[in-house]
Amino acid sequence: MEKTIDLYVKKEGAARENCFSTIGEAIEAMERIAPVPEEIAAELEKGRIYPSPVYEVTPFVVHIGAGEYREKLVLSRPNVTFLGEGRDKTVLVFGDGANEIEEDGEKRGTFRTATLRIDTPDFTARHLTFQNDAGYGHTVGQALALYVDGDRCYFEDCAMLGSQDTLFDAPLPLDPVKPNGKGPGEHKPRIRGRHLYRNCFLQGDVDFIFGSGTAYFEECTIFSKKPGDRSPEDRDTSVYGYVTAASTHPEFPYGYVLHKCKLTSDCPKGSVYLGRPWKEWAKTVFLECELGEHIHPQGWLDWGKTHGHFYYGEYNSYGPGASPETRADFSHQLTREEAEQYSMEKVLEGWFGE
C-alpha cells in the first residue's frame, strides 16, 4: 500500500510544508502531490466499487486545526481521512438552502446544498463537526450538512448539525428525484454504500437522516430539535418531526440500523416519529436504543406507502419513549434471534470502518 501523506490545515495559515489555511486548498493539493491513476479515476467516475482499501491510491490524512471553516466542499478522491482537534473545536460550516435561487434562475434544490459532499469510497472523519447553518426548513428549505455517497465511509466522534435534512446517507432513490434534475447524483449509478457512524451527535428537524444507503449508527446521540417558530397550529398537526426517512432500494438487504443510540429532543412529548418511508421499500431498525418522551407512541408513520413493502423494527427499546404495546401494527418488535441478523458484521458485511 502507498505511504500515507499528511496535510495540515490551520486558520492562521501555512507554517510548514503541506500546510494550508483552508480545507479546500488541502483537497486541491492532493492531486498535485499524488494524482489518482487515470485508470482508477475512470472507474471511480463510472461508480465502480473497489476492494478495501484502494491500494493503488495514495492515502492522505488532513489534520484540521481548531476553528470554524466556512467552506462548501466536494471530495471525490478515495483514501482520505479528515482528523479534527475535537468535534466542539473543528467546525466545517456553510449555509446553502434549497429555496435560494441560483444563477440559472432556478431554486438550488435539496441535493446541491451540502456543506460537504463525499463522492468517493474509503473516507474517514474523526473529531470534527459538519454543519449547515442556513436556517429552518420552513424558510430556507432543505439544507444538508453532509452528503455521503461512497462505500466504506466511517465517522467517529463527529457532529452533524442542521435543520431539515441534515444528513443525506446516499445513494438517491432509483427513480429520479425530478425530471432533468440537477442534483449531483441524479444520473449516477445507484451503488450501495456501507457507512458507519460511531459515537456521533446528529441534530435536525423534519426527517433529518434520509436516503438509500446502508448505514449503521453505533452509540450515537440523535437530537430532534424544535422546528423554529413554527408551532403545531401552523401546520394543523401535533407532529414535530421524524428521525429517519429511509428510501432503501428493494435489492438492498439492509437500510438504517441504530444500535445503542440515545434519542433526545426539545420537542413536546409524543411529537416525533422514529421514521417514515421516503420510498416504498424503506428499512430501518432500532436496537437497544434509549428513546426520550418526544417519541410518538405509535413510533412509525406509513406516509401512504404500501404495508408489507417497507420494514420497521425495534429490539429492546427503553426509556419514556419506548412503548411496544402502542406501536403501529405494521412495525415489528424483534426477538433476540431476529435482532442478531442486524449485527454490525452482517449489516456492513465484515467491514467495520477501521
What is each residue range found by the language model?
Residues 2-354:
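Sequence-level preference for short, compositionally simple segments enriched
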